Amino acid sequence: TNSKEGEFIAEGGGVR
C-alpha cells in the first residue's frame, strides 16, 4: 500500500 506525502499507512507503505 502506498501513501501520500505526510500520511502514514502501516500496510507496507509507511511515510513517503
From Swiss-Prot:
Signal peptide: none
Cellular compartments annotated: Secreted
Main localization of the protein described in the UniProt heading: secreted
Keywords: Adaptive immunity, Blood coagulation, Coiled coil, Disulfide bond, Hemostasis, Immunity, Innate immunity, Phosphoprotein, Secreted
UniProt modified residues of type Phosphoserine: 3
GO cellular component, one term: extracellular region
Listed transmembrane segments: none
Protein origin, superkingdom: Eukaryota
GO biological process, one term: innate immune response
PTM field: Conversion of fibrinogen to fibrin is triggered by thrombin, which cleaves fibrinopeptides A and B from alpha and beta chains, and thus exposes the N-terminal polymerization sites responsible for the formation of the soft clot. The soft clot is converted into the hard clot by factor XIIIA which catalyzes the epsilon-(gamma-glutamyl)lysine cross-linking between gamma chains (stronger) and between alpha chains (weaker) of different monomers. Forms F13A-mediated cross-links between a glutamine and the epsilon-amino group of a lysine residue, forming fibronectin-fibrinogen heteropolymers.
Complex formation: Heterohexamer; disulfide linked. Contains 2 sets of 3 non-identical chains (alpha, beta and gamma). The 2 heterotrimers are in head to head conformation with the N-termini in a small central domain.
Description of its domains: A long coiled coil structure formed by 3 polypeptide chains connects the central nodule to the C-terminal domains (distal nodules). The long C-terminal ends of the alpha chains fold back, contributing a fourth strand to the coiled coil structure.
Function per UniProt: Cleaved by the protease thrombin to yield monomers which, together with fibrinogen beta (FGB) and fibrinogen gamma (FGG), polymerize to form an insoluble fibrin matrix. Fibrin has a major function in hemostasis as one of the primary components of blood clots. In addition, functions during the early stages of wound repair to stabilize the lesion and guide cell migration during re-epithelialization. Was originally thought to be essential for platelet aggregation, based on in vitro studies using anticoagulated blood.
Name of the featured protein: Fibrinogen alpha chain
Source organism of the structure: Vulpes vulpes
